[in-house]
C-alpha cells in the first residue's frame, strides 16, 4: 500500500460527515492505510476523517509519520477497547453525522455519498450499510451458513431490505447523527471488543437506546453505503466460529441486563424462529452446513445462559 496522500478539490456537501476509523494493532497496518486512503478519496469539503488508535503507542507513532495532516490522528483517551475508541472519535468529531468504518473494511466507490444522503430526511437518526465479506481465501468455507455472516461482522441472510427499518446497524459500516449519539452518551464500555476478545453488542445497545430516546425517528438499512470487510484465514475456521457465537451469547446476556430482554432480543426471536429453520431447509443438501447452523445456535445459546447466570450471581453478591 503506498503512503496515504492528501485529497484536494473537494466539493461542498449538504450534510457534513465525521468518518471515524478505529485501529489497535500493527498487524493490520496495510488494511488500515487502505481504509483511510479509500475514505480520503471520497470526502467532501466539510467532512473530516478521525483515526483513533486504541492504546498502541507503536501504531500511533507509525501513523503520525505516515498520514497527511488533514487527518485527525488521536489516541483513545477512554477505556481500552472498541467502544472507548469510538467514544474518543465522537468526542473529537464536528460533523453532523458520524460515520464508523472498521479498520479492515474498504468503502466501495461512492459509499460516503450514499451514507450522507439518507440524513437529508430528519426522521433518520442512524443507518446501517451493506457489509460484504471479503474472504482472504476468495470465498466462504463450504460449511459456513449464510445466516451466520454476523460471526465475521458481515451481512447475513435475513436482514431487512434497503430502506427498511432495523434495530441496529452492523458496526463495520454505520452512521449516526452526532447530536443523537452524544445524547445517549455514546457506546457502552460494558460491551464491545477489547483487542482480540470476541465480544460484541455495543451497536445493538446503541440502537436500542436511540429508539428509546428518539421515538418516531428511524434507523434504516441503506445498502448503497457499502464496504468490503476483510476476513482473514484464521476467521474461516470452526474454532473461531464457535468462540464468536459463544461470546455473542455472553454479550447478549449483558445487553439483556442493561436494556431488558424484550429490547435486547427483539430481532433474535424472528431470527431463531424463522431464519434459522429456513436456513436448515435450504442447506439440506449440505450436511456440514446444517450441522454448523445447529452448532452455531447451540454455542450462542450456551453463551447466553452462562452470561445470565453470571449476571444473576453478581447481582446476588451485590445485594
Kindly label every feature range from the protein language model.
Residues 129, 145-166:
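Short, flexible, basic/aromatic active-site loop/helix in glycosyltransferases
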Amino acid at each position: 500500500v503506498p503512503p496515504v496522500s492528501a485529497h484536494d478539490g473537494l466539493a461542498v456537501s449538504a450534510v457534513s460527515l465525521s468518518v471515524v476509523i478505529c485501529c489497535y494493532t500493527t498487524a493490520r497496518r496495510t488494511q488500515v492505510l487502505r481504509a483511510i486512503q479509500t475514505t480520503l478519496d471520497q470526502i467532501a469539503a466539510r467532512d473530516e476523517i478521525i483515526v483513533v488508535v486504541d492504546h498502541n503507542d507503536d501504531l500511533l507513532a507509525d501513523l503520525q509519520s505516515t498520514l497527511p495532516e488533514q487527518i485527525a490522528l488521536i489516541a483513545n483517551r477512554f477505556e481500552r477497547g472498541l467502544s472507548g475508541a469510538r467514544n474518543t472519535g465522537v468526542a473529537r468529531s464536528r460533523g453532523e453525522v458520524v460515520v464508523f468504518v472498521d479498520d479492515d473494511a474498504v468503502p466501495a466507490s461512492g459509499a460516503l455519498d450514499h451514507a450522507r444522503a439518507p440524513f437529508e430526511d430528519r426522521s433518520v437518526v442512524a443507518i446501517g450499510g451493506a457489509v460484504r465479506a471479503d474472504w482472504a481465501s476468495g470465498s466462504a468455507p463450504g460449511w459456513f451458513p449464510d445466516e451466520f455472516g454476523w460471526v465475521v461482522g458481515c451481512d447475513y441472510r435475513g436482514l431487512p431490505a434497503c430502506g427498511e427499518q432495523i434495530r441496529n446497524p452492523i458496526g463495520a459500516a454505520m452512521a449516526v447523527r452526532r447530536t443523537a449519539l452524544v445524547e445517549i452518551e455514546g457506546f457502552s464500555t460494558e460491551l464491545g471488543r477489547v483487542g482480540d476478545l470476541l465480544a460484541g453488542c455495543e451497536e445493538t445497545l446503541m440502537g436500542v437506546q436511540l429508539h428509546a430516546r428518539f421515538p418516531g425517528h428511524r434507523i434504516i438499512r441503506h445498502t448503497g453505503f457499502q464496504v468490503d470487510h476483510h476476513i482473514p484465514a484464521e476467521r474461516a475456521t470452526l474454532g473461531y466460529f464457535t468462540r464468536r457465537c459463544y461470546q455473542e451469547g455472553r454479550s447478549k446476556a449483558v445487553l439483556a441486563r442493561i436494556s431488558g430482554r424484550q429490547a435486547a432480543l427483539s430481532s433474535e426471536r424472528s431470527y431463531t424462529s424463522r431464519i434459522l429453520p429456513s436456513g436448515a431447509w435450504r442447506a439440506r443438501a449440505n450436511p456440514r452446513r446444517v450441522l454448523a447452523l445447529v452448532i452455531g445456535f447451540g454455542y450462542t445459546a450456551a453463551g447466553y445462559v452462562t452470561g445470565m447466570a453470571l449476571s444473576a450471581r453478581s447481582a446476588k453478591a451485590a445485594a
